[in-house]
Amino acid sequence: MKKLFALLILSGIGAQAFAHPADSARIKSLNADTAKIRTVQRSLPSPLPDPPFPTSDWDGAPLIGSDATAPNYPLTKLLGLSNSRLKIYGWIDPGADISSSKNSNAPTSYDLIPNTVMLDQVGIKFDLQPNTVQTDHVSFGFLSTTIFGTDYRYTTGKGYFSNQLLGNNNKYGFDPAEMYGLIYFPKIADGMLLKIGRYISPADIEAQWATDNYLYSHSLMFTVDPYTFTGAQATFKLGSYWQLEVGVDAGNDMAPWSKSAQINGLLMARWVSHDNNNSIYGGINALGNGDYTRQHDDLQMLVATWGHKFNKTFHMMTEAYYLWQYHALVGGTVITGPPQPFYTNVGAGAPIPGTMTAVGAVNYFQILVSKRDYISIRNGYLSDPQGGRTGYATSYSDHTIGFVHYFNDYIRIRPEIRYERAYADGITPYDNGTKKDQYTAGMDLIVRF
């Protein structure tokens, strides 16, 4: 037995001594690959150039592991904050259009008043982002965004100076649309970011701020879904390619102290491919009682977004959702203020028995022309069978082609042409209920400061 044991030892030593160098190299390579697999990448290379596109990453922010610190815009530099984590900056966004409608472009949003020049948005941000790249210590941050302009009416939340819209139907107003704190915990999962306060609804390709959108106008499906939530949202990084979001809030577009507020939950997941050329982001954006309460929506929402990069020149993003709520009124949340020429759909609509539903879908197709230019083609669809979202029981489509040009890192223009129409017989939603379809040619100018 001792001789056999000695023979086995000598055989092992001999095999090691006479092993082919290529075998040793393969073993080392295998070990290196295994170590690489076990290492979580904090962030992947961004799939898109920004500028000219409004973002360099797919939908589903915040992205843990990426540096979210804002660039040093002119106001930040003027205030001597270039070397600080705190950034103070903003933008101004006037726009104009030529429309086949005379008084109102509704249900189109963010381009409401036809054949005139208007101040869509002036925004100001106070922005301090936590450091989620590191994995050593807890990090804190916050974000505050306030806007003034005609676009306030879309982000207005009941209980946040909302009488400007809900009580008066004002043309211009302001809204503190984002006010939240951030806490980053590096040791929970592969990093967890907790957001507490008022924040943008995480779903959607399109965004509330002019600076964050491919085009000047918005799709009809974006117009009628949730804009902001107030509550808490936790984002978990799970490896290199997954994130999970869990949240609780007071319902879409209302403060917790509003008498319409109801508890809603959120559960969303984000996946990207290993080359970051594909992304899927979706789940439950809002789920609760879903009871329309005290003349205000409580929208429930299932949503999914797919981003795909064909090559350096072409990419697209596609989104679809299903909305529902109970005991709603035609037209949704009630504006009790006086009718204005640009928006006459005020007062309580007729009750909708049972469940109100809506289905939306949109596709964005982008063509990179140069480092400062791109073309965006958008095709959207909205089904509003009971009129709970637009005030008219019909389905719609909207079709837009836009060209975006950056003069420099701070100034861009976004001209576009658009056609949209309703399909139900005898239904005329456009120009205050007088037309079945609408043509517009519009443009805005974004100046960052």
Question: What are the residue ranges of the model-derived segments?
Answer:
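Tryptophan-centered motif/residue detector
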Residues: D57-D67, W91, Y180, Y199, ...
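Hydrophobic alpha-helical segments, especially transmembrane helices
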Residues: K3-L4, Y199, N379
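Outer-membrane beta-barrel pore domains
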Residues: A22-D33, I37, Q41-L44, D59, ...
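Outer membrane beta-barrel
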Residues: L79-S99, S104, S109-G251, A261, ...
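N-terminal periplasmic/intermembrane-space "pro-region" immediately following the signal or transit peptide
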Residues: K2-L8, A17-S101
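Signature for the C-terminal beta-barrel architecture of outer-membrane proteins
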Residues: P52-P54, P74-L75, V133-H137, L143, ...
